[in-house]
């Protein structure tokens, strides 16, 4: 899984002792968004040499905003299991279901087939997501930095982060056949987030433009570790699907549908997105021993506090096109091999770039480096592609 969004915990997301984000009071909150990557000890290292803790908080929050926004966006597009996979219909001659199709189908891509009027399908699955890279760089070593100016003094600060972020998802699915060709499904995820962050190599340099000199230097040997977890119900999704072609057992099948996502997950613990969401989609399938399938959809999202924790108002969570396609091969009546490619487009997502900031004045000597790590907020549109097989 490409972790384009998952640097929320390795940047300067919050200071739990002296700072707060908009309507989120991190002085008292125990939410993950307030605890990582800066514990009280971590921010204490920076604050001890800062000439303005308020300016320090503002600079750190400015870096956190696009990171948290990227996380929330990613959480809206995690794949969920098919709502009809595993249904095997034993057909009697003259029944309303037409030609029996006992290919068990794909795992993460839905297909046009419906369960039939009055029938119920229930399923359960487990998924594990291990986020290990961001913008092409391993989360095992991410340098982050920022700067701020008070009067004649500019502070340049940076750290290195080693991050381990994992999400375990237990998904329950229930589908009811409202009519012969229409299904209603409910998807309920139970999420468990596990996170550990080690922050080290603290660097802090204060440049005084009036005297053209540098002041406080933080020890690069300082290291602070933080561990946290959260679990609970994620965002519940309700899905409506209608088959428009294929009810009579034809080889080709087409269905259309829509889904609504509800912000039931705790977004401040990254168990959910914090926003309502809507999705419209089309499904295509050719029924054969080797059955290709395709899903095309578009995701809309509402407003989420996680998009900007500094603001009292919520900001729209980005959406975009989605696609999923693959094929499933029937080996026998009870065994099917399936493979899928899943893609997501993220439109105008608040993001960031990692780079270097050149230090002014008499840098490059007397222990002062010529440059330091920096993190620059930006907006971008990008796509991700992942594969799955079973």
What is each model feature region?
Residues 19-146, 354-358:
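Outer-membrane beta-barrel biogenesis signature
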Residues 104, 116-118, 165-170, 231-236, ...:
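Residues that define the transmembrane beta-barrel architecture of outer-membrane proteins
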Residues 108-109, 156-160, 222-227, 265-270, ...:
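Extracellular loop and loop/strand-boundary signature of outer-membrane beta-barrel proteins
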Residues 110-111, 122-124, 172-176, 186, ...:
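Residues on the lipid-exposed face of transmembrane beta-strands in outer-membrane beta-barrel proteins
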Residues 115-117, 129, 179-181, 191, ...:
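Outer-membrane beta-barrel channels and translocator barrels
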Residues 126-132, 188-194, 235, 244, ...:
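Transmembrane beta-strands of outer-membrane beta-barrel pores
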Residues 134-139, 196-203, 266-274, 299, ...:
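Outer-membrane beta-barrel translocator domains and adjoining extracellular loop/strand segments
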Residues 142-146, 206-222, 314-390:
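Outer membrane beta-barrel transmembrane domains
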């Amino acid at each position: 899984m490409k972790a384009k969004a998952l640097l929320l915990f390795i940047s300067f997301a919050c200071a739990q002792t002296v700072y707060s984000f908009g309507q989120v009071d991190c002085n008292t909150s125990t939410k993950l968004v307030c605890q990582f990557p800066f514990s009280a000890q971590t921010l204490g290292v920076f604050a001890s040499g800062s000439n303005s803790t308020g300016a320090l908080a503002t600079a750190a929050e400015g870096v956190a905003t696009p990171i948290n926004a990227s996380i929330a966006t990613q959480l809206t597009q995690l794949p969920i299991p098919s709502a009809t996979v595993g249904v095997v219909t034993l057909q009697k001659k003259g029944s309303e279901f037409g030609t029996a199709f006992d290919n068990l189908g794909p795992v993460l891509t839905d297909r046009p087939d419906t369960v039939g009027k009055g029938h119920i399908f229930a399923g359960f699955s487990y998924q594990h997501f291990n986020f290990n890279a961001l913008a092409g760089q391993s989360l095992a070593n991410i340098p982050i930095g920022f700067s701020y100016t008070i009067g004649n003094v500019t502070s340049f600060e940076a750290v290195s982060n080693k991050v381990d972020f994992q999400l375990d998802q237990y998904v329950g699915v229930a589908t009811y056949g409202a009519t012969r060709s229409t299904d209603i499904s409910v998807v309920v995820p139970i999420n468990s987030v596990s996170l550990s962050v080690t922050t080290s190599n603290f660097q802090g340099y204060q440049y005084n433009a009036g005297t053209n000199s540098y002041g406080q230097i933080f020890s690069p040997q300082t290291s602070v570790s933080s561990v946290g977890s959260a679990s609970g119900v994620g965002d519940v999704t309700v899905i409506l699907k209608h088959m428009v072609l294929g009810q009579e057992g034809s080889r080709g099948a087409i269905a259309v549908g829509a889904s609504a996502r509800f912000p039931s997950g705790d977004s401040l613990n990254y168990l959910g997105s914090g926003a309502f969401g809507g999705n419209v989609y089309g499904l295509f399938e050719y029924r054969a021993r080797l059955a290709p399938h395709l899903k095309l959809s578009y995701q809309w999202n509402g407003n989420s506090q996680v998009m900007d924790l500094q603001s009292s108002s919520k900001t729209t969570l980005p959406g975009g096109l989605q696609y999923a396609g693959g094929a499933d091969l029937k080996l026998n009546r009870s065994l099917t091999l399936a493979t899928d490619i899943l893609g997501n487009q993220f439109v105008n997502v608040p993001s960031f770039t990692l780079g270097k900031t050149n230090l002014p004045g008499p840098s490059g000597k007397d222990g002062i480096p010529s440059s330091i790590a920096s993190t620059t907020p930006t907006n971008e549109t990008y796509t991700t592609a992942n594969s799955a097989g079973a």
